[in-house]
Amino acid sequence: MTVETQKETLGFQTEVKQLLHLMIHSLYSNKEIFLRELISNASDAADKLRFEALAKPELFEGDADLKIRLSFDKDAGTVTLEDNGIGMSREDVIAHLGTIAKSGTADFMKNLTGDQKKDSHLIGQFGVGFYSAFIVADKVDVYSRRAGQPAAEGVHWSSKGEGEFEVATIDKPQRGTRIVLHLKKDEQEFADGWRLRNVVKKYSDHIALPIQLPKEQAATEGEEQPAEEWETVNRASALWTRSRTEVKDEEYQEFYKHIGHDFENPLAWSHNKVEGKLEYNSLLYVPARAPFDLYQREAPRGLKLYVQRVFIMDQAESFLPLYLRFIKGVVDSNDLSLNVSREILQKDPIIDSMKTALTKRVLDMLEKLAKNEPEKYKGFWKNFGQVLKEGPAEDFANKEKIAGLLRFASTQDDSGEQSVALADYLARAKEGQDKIYYLTGESYAQVKNSPHLEVFRKKGIEVLLLTDRIDEWLMSYLNEFDGKAFVDIARGDLDLGKLDSEEDKKAQEEVAKDKEGLVERLKGALGDSVAEVRVSHRLTDSPAILAIGEQDLGLQMRQILEASGQKVPESKPIFEFNPSHPLIEKLDHEQSEDRFAELSHILFDQAALAAGDSLKDPAAYVRRLNKLLVELSA
C-alpha cells in the first residue's frame, strides 16, 4: 500500500463549488460526456509530453509508447482511466483541480444563464471538463506524477465533489495520471466493458492516441484466469491525415468538440490536404456560437499546430488574420521545423503562404454556407458578423470576397434584420443605378425614419441601413463592390445621376436660383453653426436636414474617437431645406429678423435630432420651442 505524506485538506474556490453544483444538476441528461472530457484531457497530456520531450527526450523515461487505458471493477463499482502523458505535480494538481483559471472565472460565472444547453456549451469552452466526472461519481481519486520528477513526488488528490478536496504526496513509479471514479449507485452501468466501448466509439474515436480496454475473454472452467490483455478500441489515427471520403460527419463533429472545447456541433468545416511546393493538412471549423471573449482582440486565438503529426502548440495565431479569430481547427505541416516557436512563426515566409491559402479556404467555406444553407449563414452572421466586418480594413487582397459575405438591413423591408447581401441589392437595383446607397446611424428606428430617405422612398430606390458601431469605419475601407461605388446618402451634395430625369435637374436648378435670397438669410441667422446652407434635393416631407461635408467624420466615427479619448477634428454640418415645405414658405415670408433667427435655430436643432445627434445647447432649444408654443396658443 502506498504511504501518503504531507496530507492536507483544502477548500474549493467558490466558483468551483458553483460549477460542481451546475455539473451535477444541469448536465445529468448528457452524462456520457464525462468520459469524453477525461479522454480529451488525457490526449492533451500526451500532446504536451511529446512537445516537451522534443527538447528533453529523457522525459519519456524509456516509455515513448503513449496511450490511454480504461478499466472497470464491477464489484467495487469503479471506472479507472490512466494515461502516461505529462502528468501533474502537487502544485499542478492544486492549481488545476481546485480552481478554475483566474482569467476565465469571472467571465464564466457572468455568462451562466440557467439554460442547460447554453451552460453546457460554456463548460466546454472554459476547459473545466474534469469536473464532469462528478455527474456519475460521488467520489473521485486522482493519482499523478509529472514526467521528470522522482517517483517519491507523486500526488494523490481526492474529493467527494462537495466543498473540499484532500491532497497527499505518494510514491508513483509510473509518470502520468490515473483517475478512479467511484460510481454513484444509479450509475453502475458504466462499470461495463461494452458500455465503455460504445461511449469511446461515439465520442472519442477520433483521438489520435490509442484508447485501450481489457480484452473481453472468459476462462474455461478449471483453467487459470488468462493474463490481462489490452485491445485498442478507437481508430487511433490523426483524423486530419485521413482521406475525406473515409471520415463520417459524426467523426468531424466529435473531433471539433474535442479541439474546440464545445458541446455543440460546428456550422461547417473544411478538410484539405495540400501537396506540391508546400505540404500540409488542414481541418478548419466554423463554430455555431460566438465565444465569450470574441470582441477581446487580445484574447488567445488560433489553430492547433502540428509538425509531422507532433503537437507543437495551441493557439498558433499566425495562420489566420484577426478578423477570422473565431475559426477553430488543426494545421499539420511537413515543411516547418519541430523546434518552431511563436517568434519564428511571425517571420517565416512559409507561414505567409499558408496563411493566404487558409484564409481563402475559410472565405470559400463561408461563401458555400451562405449559398447552400442561408438559414445557417443567418445564424453565423448574428454571431460573427461584426467581427467579419473588420476584414476589409485588415485584408485588402480579399476585400471583394469579404464584401460579398457581408449582410445589411435595408429599406427593402421593415424587419431590421441584417439579411441583404450586396449581390442581392444590385440584382434589385433600378435601371440606370450605378451606385450602392447606404445610411449609417445609431439605431434601426432612427435610420429607417431618417429624412435622408425621403427622395429614395419616392423614387423606389433601395438604401442599406447600417447601425452597428463599426459600420462607418467599415465603409471608409469599402469603396466599391462589383464596380459600383458606395454612396453615403447623408454626405455631401446628393447626385442621383441617371435616376434624376433632365426635368428634375432643371427644376432643381430653377428652385436653387429662386431661393438664393432665403439661403443668404439662413446663413446670416445660423452663422457659425453651419458650414453651408443650400436647397435640398433629398427632402419631400421634412422641412430641413443636416448633411455631412464630403471629407468630414460622421456621427459614429466621432463617437468612437470621443469614447477612446482621441481628439475629434472640428466640423460643421451643411443645412439643407425643403423649399416646398409650408414651414419654409412661412419662414421665407417672415418680416421680423429676430423671429426668423429663432425659427431657423429651431429647424436646425430639429434636423440635428433627426440625424441622431445631440444638441450642443438643449436648454436654448427648449426655450425657443416654448416661446413658439406660447405664441401659437395665444
Swiss-Prot record:
MF annotations from Gene Ontology: ATP binding; ATP hydrolysis activity; ATP-dependent protein folding chaperone; unfolded protein binding
Family: Belongs to the heat shock protein 90 family.
Pfam families: HATPase_c_3, HSP90
Superkingdom field: Bacteria
Name of the featured protein: Chaperone protein HtpG
Matching InterPro entries: HATPase_C_sf, Heat_shock_protein_90_CS, HSP90_C, Hsp90_fam, Hsp90_N, Ribosomal_Su5_D2-typ_SF
Region (B): 343-559
SMART domains: HATPase_c (SM00387)
PANTHER family documented for this protein: HEAT SHOCK PROTEIN 90 FAMILY MEMBER
UniProt entry keywords in alphabetical sequence: ATP-binding, Chaperone, Cytoplasm, Nucleotide-binding, Stress response
GO terms under cellular component: cytoplasm
Stated role: Molecular chaperone. Has ATPase activity.
A: annotated span: 1-342
Compartment annotation: Cytoplasm
Subunit structure: Homodimer.
Location of region: C: 560-634
